[in-house]
Regions:
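N-terminal glycine-rich, Lys/His-bearing helix-loop that initiates the first secondary-structure elements
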Residues: 1-12, 16
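Short active-site-adjacent helix-start/loop capping segments
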Residues: 8, 30, 60-64, 70-73, ...
Length: 118
């Protein structure tokens, strides 16, 4: 869905994208299954073990940190700041803790992590 940016900050989309959006809007989907199937499709394209679509870079950072710290535990998803989880350090090379609209460190903390700059 790339195109020229406008003063409004949006991109024009192709007919194929519009058709896909229309199809999505006119049909019902079980969201959990859609997420699983979409992740599998993207993982195959990327030759990766798995994939997950997120809404933004911030969401991706927070969710990735939560997944690593929680080691797949659903408990951690609902209790990201629990004292039961002691290994929270996320090592970032100096200069990578940048502010892209929000500091990387803030999103690491959202996922329950603690930044350690190396």
């Amino acid at each position: 869905a790339s195109g020229k940016m406008t003063i409004l900050g949006v991109s024009k989309v192709s007919e194929a994208v519009l058709a896909a959006q229309r199809f999505g809007g006119e049909h019902f989907f079980e969201m959990s299954e859609l997420s699983v199937q979409t992740g599998a499709f993207l993982a195959n394209l990327l030759k990766a073990e798995d994939a997950q679509i997120v809404s933004s870079a911030s969401a991706g950072i927070a969710q990735a940190v939560a997944a690593l710290i929680g080691k797949g535990s659903l408990y951690h998803a609902y209790h990201p700041y629990t004292e039961k989880i002691e290994q929270r350090e996320i090592i970032l090379p100096k200069g990578h803790n940048v502010d892209y609209g929000t500091p990387v460190e803030v999103m690491v903390a959202q996922g329950g992590g603690q930044v350690v700059e190396a």
